[in-house]
Amino acid sequence: MNIQKFLKKKIKKICIKLGLPENFNPIIQKNIKKKNIDYQINGIIKLKKKKSNYHYKLAKKISYYMNKSKIYKKISISKPGFINITLDSNWICTNINNMFIAKNFNISFKKPKKIIIDYSSPNIAKEMHVGHLRSTILGDTTARILKFLGHNVIKQNHIGDWGIQFGMLITQLKLESKISFKNIEKIYKKSYLNYKKNPIFFKKTKKNVVKLQKKDKKCIYIWKKIVKKSIKKNNKVYKKLNVSLKKKDIRGESFYNFMLPGIISDLKKKKIAVNYQGCVIVYLKNFKNRLGKKMGVVIQKKDGAFLYTTTDIACLKYRCKTLKADRIIYYIDNRQKQHLLQIWNIAKKAKYFTKKILLEHHSFGMILHKNKKPFKTRNGDTIKLIKLLNKGVTKAKEKIKKKNRKIKKKELKKIAHNIGIGAIKYFDLSKKRKLDYIFDWDKMLSLEGNTAPYIQYAYIRIKSIIKKNTTIFQNDKYKINIFTSFERQLIFSIFQFEEIIHILEKKGTPHLMCNYLYDLSGKFSKFYENCSILNAKEKHIKISRIKLSILTSKIIKKCLYFLGIKTVSKM
């Protein structure tokens, strides 16, 4: 239950009744300073002062109407105009018990929308590297949450499966004594060097790009083989990462090729694009070049070749006109901001989408080394994502073996995988999305602080309590009740679950979910340390506390699921 939203709705009704404007925001915050106060209304003091003591008198009027409701135990006012709320324990217990028995934690669902999420999107012919981690796991977390909330989620893995790199690869493979697709990355590096240094190779590459566009049989055969091989490798990474992307979610750049000539002619027809020195260019007023003049965006080269911008315009049109999206979220790093804004600007001019469609760039920062430079190998090469994940599992395995030398190999393998991968993902997702962060093995694998191992361990501890009482919690006669302040604080933390879910639905900020998990686990630890659960003298207290433990464990597991992290049975 989202208590803040519930209270805000009730209080706004009173405020409108008292003549305050409909757009007035009462601002309700969880109280963390004063004992015996649950929430505080502090938006009143932001209103323009009319007379002396205006805010205090208005707070008194609002509290008068609030006192008519049975959901409040106590309402007090503090100067200059704060309203302090203590909620009724019976009302709290009714709602926490409803949450306990409900299928989806009694969360309120909005009208479902068709939401497209563009994420991961690696280039073909290269192995996924550490730079793909953020887009992949940020996008996947959002996809899981939106699906849970009943939205029609369309995941789009916009892979780079077209362009000049395939001309280079085809040229190089034709030069090899035997065409082999075993090590595409090595062939790509070789082809790139030849393309840069060898003028003959450069010309052949251009010719092979044209041949590929004209669907030459041999070129298409090589292209398909490269794409298939790369997708197979990427899928292994997704599986290891516990990411929900599947083959059906792939819609690469090549998919939109059939639309590109039509996009060019349409933009020219609408006088958005013009011919200039053999190229087709769109001039944008909102973007300036180095000379301070309108920036020109090339959408077709002299040789007739299309650019990434052209493909991305076609892609946006397809998502809006054909897939009928209500909202499109792009998980692309900060450096692509201008490129994305230019696409949206051109597509808006062409009326490829309406104002009703929400376009969002959920940008993110970089992963840095301890020296605050981009996270790379000692040689300066990009770190392969699969190698990073394997290293995480190995490090987790070493930690587990130190604590539990008798653990069986099969069990060790599974637990180390879930802890190692979980640690990498959680460490990333716990950081503010828009900021860069420093990659640190010791911090992410620590059992202390806001880390995956800490949360996974908290879950194990709760489950051990429940396992000892597998039948008692099924008793419907006794409900969750409040006997101490520790239970009350834990219940309020549980109530915040819905609030966090809806913030992530709007903003795609999973660090808030990680902070929430850490707070919830901490509140449970205090409850566990100060309240007797298994040894409670009275049956109704014992059952109440076990049920509260069960609900906490379910929410921790669900939050970890949203983050794409698996729980473990032991550590």
UniProtKB/Swiss-Prot annotation:
The UniProt entry's sequence similarity note says: Belongs to the class-I aminoacyl-tRNA synthetase family.
Q: What Gene Ontology molecular-function terms does this entry list?
A: arginine-tRNA ligase activity; ATP binding
Is the keyword Calcium in the record? no
| Alphabetical list of HAMAP family matching this protein | Arg_tRNA_synth
Q: Name one GO biological process term.
A: arginyl-tRNA aminoacylation
Tell me its EC number(s), please: 6.1.1.19
GO CC annotations, alphabetized: cytoplasm
Please report the name of this protein according to its UniProt entry.
Arginine--tRNA ligase
Question: Where does this one sit in the cell?
Answer: Cytoplasm
Residue numbers covered by motif 'HIGH' region = 122-132
Aminoacyl-tRNA synthetase as a keyword of this entry, yes or no, is yes
